[in-house]
Amino acid sequence: MAAGNTYSEEVLKATNWLQDNAQKEAFSYVFKTQKVNLNGKEIAWNNYNKDTTDAEMINLQRGAETSWDQATDMEWESEIDSLTKGQVLIFDSLVKKCLFEGILQKNLSPSDCYWFIQHEHGQDTGYHCHVLLGGKGLQQAMGKWFRKQLNNLWSRWLIMQCKVPLTPVERIKLRELAEDGEWVSLLTYTHKQTKKQYTKMTHFGNMIAYYFLNKKRKTTEREHGYYLSSDSGFMTNFLKEGERHLVSHLFTEANKPETVETTVTTAQEAKRGKIQTKKEVSIKCTIRDLVNKRCTSIEDWMMTDPDSYIEMMAQTGGENLIKNTLEITTLTLARTKTAYDLILEKAKPSMLPTFNISNTRTCKIFSMHNWNYIKCCHAITCVLNRQGGKRNTILFHGPASTGKSIIAQHIANLVGNVGCYNAANVNFPFNDCTNKNLIWIEEAGNFSNQVNQFKAICSGQTIRIDQKGKGSKQIEPTPVIMTTNEDITKVRIGCEERPEHTQPIRDRMLNINLTRKLPGDFGLLEETEWPLICAWLVKKGYQATMASYMHHWGNVPDWSEKWEEPKMQTPINTPTDSQISTSVKTSPADNNYAATPIQEDLDLALALEPWSEPTTPTFTTALTQHARFSNTDTSPTWSEIETDIRACFGENCAPTTNLE
């Protein structure tokens, strides 16, 4: 450098080291803690300061303390208390311990790796530690593996350093919270097509110079900034705050690209050639706010942002302006988000560590049928994420009061941007289904002449439909959710039944046949239920893609899918988890109706039409049957009922009549 004589040797060495490592790729991890309450015991970030006798840990803490003292600017008196300083030194030793153990587990040499560590305290995040890790043999595909190993090591060392007295069960629970809550996170990005999370590699030197070295040092309890930093080359360990900023400035100047003043005018800009009016700016801001707030109807707009609604209503042609604004909003949501995305974004991360999927009402409904409720929920999320292929419709069918509508209504309310099929409008039944994230068909019946249009929409095809008083409009692939008490696979046009439509309709349906009647006090689904179910599935590796579904369950679901296979596995050695109930038994006396054969005893025709009633007469009351079967766990079969009926008309039980 030309001006090298004006800078210290440490500054020049650090700058040259960053230049040499500017384009090297590295993983970006964040180590953190969360405030936990276990049986009334508060555990905060500064409670992991238990004294240690480990010689290696003590040496690491001494080295960190030396770096802290050397990097302190003596012109400014630090107000950081000794307890906070000691806690940061302990965390520094723990992070390095985790880092080196993770490297050795991969059979890598620490000398072949380069790393950078910086401890910080943020306004919203509190204490956290940034770690950049790269080296020979470290590839992008290994990022998630390292995150999992570092997370396990971090939780183990935190338990050992926790000064709050905990019972063995509480220690296990704290470690579960640390591992399930991902107290070590990895920088990732979402692929536009697959919607999967992939590891995001960073440029090692650029990241340090442009981001970490520009931060202010935390010197008071009220300020936010960095505490301490270190690296594999010992180049930034002892730099004071001013020297760090100088290194960042020199690095930026050395890598500044040559600028050439250019002016490019596009055809649209030349044609417009004017400044946007205040009205245009206001409309654009309103559309952006409506999209961010997920407002898709006039009522939602009135409730969430009444000021902008009144402002548009007061303008000339206000009704048309409001209508067009909402149309742009719904179009934006329909093209940029899926129904699954709109549900998942409502999940609260703070509730996920304590969430138990088996306690949700949806899974209880599936458990009544002895189904694998994880498999059912996974299949539903795939369809909502437009990953079901031709099977683009979720069909809840069965008798009344079995939970069909409460699940469908809950999902539709969470999505918000929903179109409804109107069977009463014979000519334009799908008039309300354009620019939507989900189509809801409640109590579907015979589709008659609309069956071909219905099949096209249910298979996720892009078709054009006619609208009343308008021209035709295109419907993009949109998932459909449907509830019915009838057999929609039987299509009747006039008085003629058309069996050729039965199999094509089945090929388009995710068949969920609910047959168990719910008790009267079952209640509705909680608002947070399905968002947490989706988040739980993602955390456990059940991505909302058909590739993930086939990986876990073997094949794509079809009309005769056996939801009870594979059977649910009860977790063991988990003292904090509640037992998962996979079945709900009810007796005829509980619901006050005459006992009828259970679904498993019906023949194939009744199995396909579970809402049809058997024609066999019933000769005993509910209370009598309940008393008879109180000592058994299974319901009577057809053969048992037939035996009872014959016994009632036998010689011993024949009724006597008086002819007089």
Swiss-Prot record:
Motif RCR-2 per record, residues: 128-130
InterPro entries: Helicase_SF3_DNA-vir (IPR014015), P-loop_NTPase (IPR027417), Parvovirus_NS1_C (IPR021972), Parvovirus_NS1_helicase (IPR001257), Parvovirus_NS1_N (IPR021076), PV_NS1-NUC (IPR049901)
Every SF3 helicase domain range: 365-527
Cofactor(s) the protein needs: Mg(2+)
Entry-linked Gene3D superfamilies: 3.40.1310.20, P-loop containing nucleotide triphosphate hydrolases (3.40.50.300)
Motif RCR-3: positions: 211-215
Residues the record lists as binding ATP: 398-405
A cellular component annotation (GO) from this entry: host cell nucleus
Residues annotated to bind a divalent metal cation: 120, 128, 130
Region of interest: Ori-binding: 192-196
E.C. no: 3.1.21.-, 3.6.4.12
One Pfam entry name: PV_NSP1
Record PTM: Phosphorylated.
Catalytic activity: ATP + H2O = ADP + phosphate + H(+)
PV NS1-Nuc domain ranges (all copies): 22-262
UniProt record, GO biological process: DNA replication; symbiont-mediated arrest of host cell cycle during G2/M transition; symbiont-mediated perturbation of host apoptosis; symbiont-mediated perturbation of host cell cycle G1/S transition checkpoint; viral DNA genome replication
An MF annotation (GO) of this entry: endonuclease activity
Domain of life: Viruses
Cofactor stoichiometry and binding remark: The endonuclease active site can probably bind other divalent cations.
Homology family: Belongs to the parvoviruses initiator protein NS1 family.
Function: Multifunctional protein which displays endonuclease and helicase activities required for initiating and directing viral DNA replication. Also plays a role in viral packaging and transactivation of several promoters. Binds site-specifically to 2-3 approximate tandem copies within the origins of replication (Ori), unwinds this hairpin region and nicks one DNA strand thereby initiating the rolling circle replication (RCR). Cooperatively binds Ori with host PIF and probably other host factors, which activate the nickase function of NS1.
Name this protein carries in UniProt: Initiator protein NS1
Species: Porcine parvovirus (strain NADL-2) (PPV)
